[in-house]
């Protein structure tokens, strides 16, 4: 007996509940103050795979104090991501070690990460079995810029 199940559509499903021949992608961020830049990134990421898993960083400032603590609660960010049509599955993590564990245990074929990481070491970059796709950033949307606008600071 195989570990596959057949879903309502008659396609073979893996133990994770998706088609066994689907190409699975993974991207991660804190997704604080979800904005147009995040949506464009998730759209581009979803175009690289059949099933997109998102790693939701609970609080980047825990390990890196120079990073901004999220303004929105984890619950708010989860609700927003759950409502995004480009996201198929969400896993939370706090530390880079937890992210590494996700990368090592989830059935990921492609890691999707920002183009600013090209040529740099990043969590999971040593995992040779992952293909890496670098998201483009051809827009000006950012959480930092949004925070400045909210605080009436010059952009």
PLM regions: where:
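Nucleotidyltransferase catalytic core that binds NTPs
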Residues: 1-155
């Amino acid at each position: 007996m195989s570990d596959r199940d057949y879903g309502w559509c008659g396609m073979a499903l893996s133990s994770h509940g998706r088609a066994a021949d689907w190409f699975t992608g993974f991207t991660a961020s804190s997704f604080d103050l979800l904005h147009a830049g995040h949506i464009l990134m998730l759209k581009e990421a979803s175009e690289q795979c059949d099933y997109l898993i998102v790693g939701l960083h609970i609080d980047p400032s825990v390990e890196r104090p120079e990073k901004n603590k999220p303004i929105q609660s984890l619950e708010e960010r989860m609700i927003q991501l759950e409502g995004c049509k480009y996201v198929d599955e969400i896993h939370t993590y706090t530390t880079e070690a937890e992210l590494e564990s996700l990368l090592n245990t989830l059935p990921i074929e492609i890691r999707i990460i920002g183009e600013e990481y090209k040529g740099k070491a990043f969590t999971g970059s040593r995992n040779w079995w992952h293909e890496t796709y670098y998201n483009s950033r051809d827009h000006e949307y950012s959480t930092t810029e949004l925070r400045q606008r909210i605080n009436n600071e010059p952009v």
